[in-house]
């Protein structure tokens, strides 16, 4: 006979895990207003689950989450464009915790060209 508590616990866990994954990969950790940052790439780690740029802006190092490889490619953004020394502007959403210098990019602007990673976000 199955233990009701074990079944209920399993069901609760199964329902909770997808929301935890969405929270990490979603936008809930970020502010709702658009934030803009201009700086120079110090380093880049591109790939899944998403790329990470370290950007120096006004004397502070920021961590910028860019898209997954398919999202960057769809926007026309190539890995060769996201290398150390490139100056860029990022528009997106910064962390709600203002002590953290972290943001998620919705748009990347290089040499005046806009690469929209999330065209559905204004």
Predicted regions and their residues:
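Short aromatic-glycine-enriched beta-strand elements
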Residues: 48-56
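Short boundary/loop segments of OB/S1/cold-shock single-stranded nucleic-acid-binding domains
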Residues: 21-34
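Structural detector for short beta-strands of small beta-barrel domains
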Residues: 33-49
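N-terminal export leaders
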Residues: 6-8
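A short macromolecule-binding patch
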Residues: 60-68
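Short nucleic-acid-contacting surface segments enriched for D/E, G, S/T with interspersed K/R
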Residues: 74-89
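OB-fold/S1-family single-stranded nucleic acid-binding modules
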Residues: 95-119
């Amino acid at each position: 006979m199955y233990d009701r508590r074990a079944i209920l616990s399993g069901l609760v866990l199964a329902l909770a895990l997808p929301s935890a994954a969405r929270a990490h990969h979603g936008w809930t950790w970020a502010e709702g207003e658009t934030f803009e940052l201009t700086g120079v790439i110090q380093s880049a780690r591109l790939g899944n689950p998403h790329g990470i740029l370290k950007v120096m802006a006004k004397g502070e190092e920021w961590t910028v989450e860019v898209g997954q490889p398919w999202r960057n490619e769809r926007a026309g953004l190539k890995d060769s464009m996201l290398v150390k020394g490139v100056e860029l502007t990022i528009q997106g959403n910064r962390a709600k915790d203002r002590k953290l210098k972290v943001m998620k990019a919705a748009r990347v602007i290089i040499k005046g060209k806009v690469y929209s990673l999330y065209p559905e976000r204004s």
